[in-house]
Amino acid sequence: MIPGEIFYGSGDIEMNAAALSRLQMRIINAGDRPVQVGSHVHLPQANRALSFDRATAHGYRLDIPAATAVRFEPGIPQIVGLVPLGGRREVPGLTLNPPGRLDR
């Protein structure tokens, strides 16, 4: 082995393979400026200019790689994949009314 050498595994890596369920959702930015939503944001708490079924999205985040985001341009609908938030499923909140524990 050479110091700093990296050995890669063989085969493909399936993103969010442990997700128990997946949803597809249509989201449209009804605002006048672009909105970006990061990979681990509890989707119902995302920018209020985004129009989608927030009740159905409760407990879900975007199905995208960690540390990335999706940009929603004004007036352009997008279909995005969603996966359940993992871990302890606690959301401290991005708003004044955080949901707290998702599974009560």
Curated annotation (Swiss-Prot):
Gene3D superfamilies xrefs: Urease, beta subunit
Family annotation (InterPro entries): Urease_beta-like, Urease_betasu_sf, Urease_subunit
Family: Belongs to the urease beta subunit family.
NCBIfam families documented for this protein: PRK13202.1, urease_beta
GO cellular component, one term: urease complex
Primary location class: cytoplasm
Enzyme Commission numbers on file: 3.5.1.5
Protein name as annotated: Urease subunit beta
Domain of life of the source: Bacteria
Keyword Nucleotidyltransferase: no
Gene: ureB
Pathway: Nitrogen metabolism; urea degradation; CO(2) and NH(3) from urea (urease route): step 1/1
Top EC class of this enzyme: hydrolase
Protein's organism: Mycobacterium tuberculosis (strain ATCC 25618 / H37Rv)
Catalysed conversion reaction: urea + 2 H2O + H(+) = hydrogencarbonate + 2 NH4(+)
Subcellular location: Cytoplasm
GO biological process: urea catabolic process
pH-dependence annotation: Optimum pH is 7.2.
Description of how the protein assembles with itself and partners: Heterotrimer of UreA (gamma), UreB (beta) and UreC (alpha) subunits. Three heterotrimers associate to form the active enzyme.
A single GO molecular function term of this UniProt record: urease activity
